[in-house]
Amino acid sequence: MNFQWLNESNLTKEGEKITIYAPAGTDFFCNDGTVSEEGVTPESLHNAPFYYTELSGDFVLTVKVSHDFKDTYDSSSLMVMEDLKNWAKSCFEKTDFGTHAAVSVVTKNGRSDDANGCNLSGNTAMASNLQSQ
């Protein structure tokens, strides 16, 4: 597969293992000005490292992720993108509740909606499945 970068960063490969280093303060999130229950307006960012390949047709992608969590919202993410205004990502994230959880973010027409799932411990597996309708 021919992989490319959007927002290039450092990457190491060891056998089948790929490690990508994300600088602090990077993310993919589109805020339309909505203020959270805590009174915070999340910043819109498109600056996280994104190492990708273009695919067509149906596919299933499964990965095992681990993370050295340091700060709130640090995550390992699996992302499917049509363009910068339409994409989805599943994350293994350090939440603002101090837990590690499965988190999903769906962005449609430039507006992101995120949802925290169950709390997780240790490493986790994530999968992305895209099928034609």
Predicted stretch roles:
Residues M1-Q133:
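Extracellular glycan-recognition regions
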